[in-house]
Amino acid sequence: MEIRPTRIELIRTRRRIKLARKGLDLLKMKRSALIYEFLQISRTIRGMRENLRREVEDALNTIRTAEILEGQVALERIANMSSDSTINVDSRNVMGVVIPTLNLTYNLSILSDVYRTISVPVAINDAIDRFQRLFLNLIQILEKENALRNLLIEIDKTKRRSNAIENILIPRLEYQAKMIKMMLDERERDTFTTLKTIKKKIEAGKDEE
């Protein structure tokens, strides 16, 4: 590492140390915010997963009940009238991390809310509601799992950058500043000694006169 022992270089190096420390503080704050967001989503998704098994069992029970009460033919007929669903992918930004958001929409079909209220038996209606709710919850869990994955990648990246600044860049700059200061001090001492010697010679010359 080439060191230029000048006062300007010392000022620049000290300025770089200050900026590096400021950047390190910002990275640590960012990492703390990302970890907080990660833990919040983890708690939410844990609760959603715990409820998911019960929701699956409830949905299967309602479809069995509907089949017993209305028959398989009626179920299949209404199932064929159901609309396709579309998942739209959007995103939100959390401390510079792009988090995908998934929005579920149902396309228009014969099986409208009005038609269901008038023509679809209650047991089948209940089964439709349960499965739509279950599907929506699955989409939300998938969205949050993607968010956790992206946050984890960014947390790791931020940690590596922080470590590089804290353990490599700042110590290197501090060593550089220390060496420049030592070299400047040494130069000043040499200059002072030289001037002192010159002064003595001048004074000695005067005495000889």
From Swiss-Prot:
Its Gene Ontology cellular component terms are:
plasma membrane
What are the GO BP annotations of this UniProt entry?
A: proton motive force-driven plasma membrane ATP synthesis
In the bilayer, the protein is annotated as: Peripheral membrane protein
Q: Where in the cell is it found?
A: Cell membrane
Q: Which UniProt keywords apply?
A: ATP synthesis, Cell membrane, Hydrogen ion transport, Ion transport, Membrane, Transport
Cite the GO molecular-function annotations of the record. ATP binding; proton-transporting ATP synthase activity, rotational mechanism; proton-transporting ATPase activity, rotational mechanism
Signal peptide boundaries: none
Against Pfam families, the record matches this protein to: ATP-synt_D
Which InterPro entries does its entry note? V_ATPase_D
Source organism superkingdom: Archaea
Its annotated function is as follows: Component of the A-type ATP synthase that produces ATP from ADP in the presence of a proton gradient across the membrane.
The family assignment reads: Belongs to the V-ATPase D subunit family.
Q: How does it assemble?
A: Has multiple subunits with at least A(3), B(3), C, D, E, F, H, I and proteolipid K(x).
* Protein name stated in the entry: A-type ATP synthase subunit D
